[in-house]
Amino acid sequence: MIEINQVNKVFYQGSKEIHALKDINLHIAEGTIFGVIGSSGAGKSTLIRCVNMLEAPTSGSIVVDGVDLTKLSKKQLSETRRNIGMIFQHFNLLSSRTVFDNVALPLELAGKDKEQIQSKVTELLKLVGLADKHESYPANLSGGQKQRVAIARALASDPKVLLCDEATSALDPATTQSILELLKEINRKLKITILLITHEMDVVKSICHEVAIIGGGELVEKGTVGEIFAHPKTELAHDFIRSTLDLSIPEDYQVRLQPTRVAGSYPLVRLEFTGATVDAPLVSQISRKYNIDISILSSDLDYAGGVKFGMMVAELFGNEEDDNAAIEYLREHNVKVEVLGYVL
């Protein structure tokens, strides 16, 4: 449905070249929800703007539903964009128009008659849960309701693709989840392909079938959500997965943490479990095998793409040789171990 082939994008500041995208290759299958995640400045917003040619790639091709957008005239591109809906972080609603009229705008511009507009807008407002808000104005809506209006407007032209540019980042957690559930429902009911960008791994975990991780304008890693969470190959992927779990080191431990091991101190470790390692009794195994005591300070477990993953912060109480052997045993069994320091 969407093919991004060897796409590069260069911006210029005077004589300075800024490479926002570097040789990006992605294939997004029809009917999937595909996430692109990256930190601020990673290039993800530039990428999604290239997909509907709001930004023209410096080189490479963008193919949507078999049509190479980079080869179209302005008139052809304008017509083709009707197959591509887009929603934004800040909604972009017209404050002087009612909810009904905001959703009707693309239909008016397409020359639809009043009867067609009435029928389509009523159907869409029902779909997004705003059937009772026809005559309301944006100023009287919550953030979540405004985004629902924006989604309805984006669907007015019956697009085959819906682009979501940080669509939930301005919303509170509960509202974010309700918007994600709505997007899942739209994907299921309308069979529409959804490409969304985000800086939050929780969004990817909640809604996406596949994900690409972007850093410094480059494609770092891609795969199904289950694959990425079960077998992250890069440190950036580990960082994003870690961000979905709430693990904090108690303040009294932080002040006692030493960078090197001294007499009377013990290692504080962060353990990352993915896939099969989550269910394996590895912690009890190292306790028995190496005769060490283990104090668990915090732990968290979650699911994504049908895969369990979890993290744990623990203190190991043994002699230095046994502690090191236990850490090596965990690593040999595909647990990522980070020694955070030594607690005195």
From Swiss-Prot:
It catalyses: L-methionine(out) + ATP + H2O = L-methionine(in) + ADP + phosphate + H(+); D-methionine(out) + ATP + H2O = D-methionine(in) + ADP + phosphate + H(+). It holds the Pfam family NIL. Its main location: membrane. It comes from the Bacteria. InterPro entries: AAA+_ATPase, ABC_MetN_proteobac, ABC_transporter-like_ATP-bd, ABC_transporter-like_CS, ACT-like_dom_sf, MetN_ABC, MetN_ABC_transporter-like, NIL_domain. The complex is composed of two ATP-binding proteins (MetN), two transmembrane proteins (MetI) and a solute-binding protein (MetQ). This is Methionine import ATP-binding protein MetN. The lineage of its organism: Bacteria, Pseudomonadati, Pseudomonadota, Gammaproteobacteria, Vibrionales.
